[in-house]
């Protein structure tokens, strides 16, 4: 793709970089942001980065700047705090109605809600004694259908089977 075509997606790409590559402990300065954009075939000048960050801030994104040596920009506010994501991961892993495969998929999706660095902290194993994981891959869909029926005020019938 020619570099000029990449300019249309520059603002969104810059936001994705800040979401994935920054947190309070991992900052990116303007030259690093320019380099990461260039890796995505997007040309950027130093002045345009400042303008783009101002635009993102005006759109409600909490992008902070730490000045001085080792300083740079980071996305300060996210939908979930890291501690909240850890709680959700623990709940998913401890749930007996969620299969190990589905747990892994859900945790991977939760990792996308924080920086790459914080995401590695979500890879933890919770063991609940005496609570086996379900083998059913369709159990979540069944639970969702049950909730939908209850919310719609519909009658629900169960058919039990052994094993």
Language model features with spans:
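Short, basic/aromatic recognition patches that contact phosphate-bearing ligands
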Residues: 1-90
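Bulky hydrophobic/aromatic content
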Residues: 79-161
């Amino acid at each position: 793709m020619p570099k000029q075509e990449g300019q249309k997606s520059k603002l969104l790409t810059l936001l994705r970089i800040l979401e994935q590559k920054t947190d309070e402990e991992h900052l990116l300065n303007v030259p690093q942001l320019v380099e990461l954009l260039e890796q995505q075939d997007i040309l950027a000048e130093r002045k345009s980065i400042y303008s783009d960050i101002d635009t993102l801030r005006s759109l409600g994104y909490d992008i902070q700047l730490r000045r001085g040596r080792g300083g740079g920009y980071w996305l300060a506010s996210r939908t979930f705090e890291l501690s909240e994501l850890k709680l959700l991961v623990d709940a998913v892993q401890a749930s007996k109605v969620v299969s190990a495969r589905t747990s892994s998929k859900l945790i991977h999706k939760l990792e996308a809600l924080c920086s790459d660095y914080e995401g590695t902290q979500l890879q933890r194993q919770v063991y609940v004694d005496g609570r086996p994981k379900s083998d059913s891959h369709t159990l979540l869909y069944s639970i969702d259908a049950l909730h939908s029926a209850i919310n719609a005020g519909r009658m629900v019938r169960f058919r039990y089977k052994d094993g």
